[in-house]
A protein has these predicted regions:
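Extracytoplasmic metal-acquisition and chelation regions
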Residues: 1-140
Length: 140
């Protein structure tokens, strides 16, 4: 029971950080490789724009890329997120074309071998995700 309560407290701390992030962030829009973060965005009043829709394997059209690059520039988005288990190639291309940089936002779909070797778990990965969101949305 103590372990459950301790873990619940850590989850509440993550939720509190995300709530504070949403309240403090001057930028609410973030760009991701694919639309894996809709629930997070909706729950915390943020706006996700995905390069490739739902599937991480889909290829955007040239028109999609042009519109996305315009959105990034118009909204002064400083970072384009990519995922740990997906090639960062398209995110890097979009970032370069728009003057942004890339960061990792992990959808927690699986652990890489490096992640397993580092002892990563849900709490550690979400903490890194929040750190990166704070940076991307102008809180840090």
């Amino acid at each position: 029971k103590k372990n459950i309560e301790a873990y619940q407290e850590k989850l509440l701390q993550l939720d509190q950080r995300l709530t504070e992030l949403s309240a403090k962030a001057p930028q609410k829009l973030f760009v991701t490789t694919h639309a894996a973060f809709g629930h997070l965005a909706e729950d915390y009043g943020l706006q996700q724009v995905a390069i490739m829709g739902i599937s991480p394997d889909a290829e955007p059209t040239p028109a999609d890329l042009k519109n996305l690059i315009s959105t990034i520039k118009d909204n002064q988005v400083k970072y384009v997120f990519f995922e740990t288990l997906v090639s960062p190639r398209i995110a890097q291309t979009v970032a370069e074309a728009s003057g942004a940089e890339t960061l990792v936002l992990d959808p927690l779909e699986g652990l890489s071998e490096a992640g397993r070797n580092n002892g990563d778990d849900y709490l550690k990965i979400m903490t890194r995700n929040i750190d990166n969101l704070e940076l991307a949305l102008g809180v840090k």
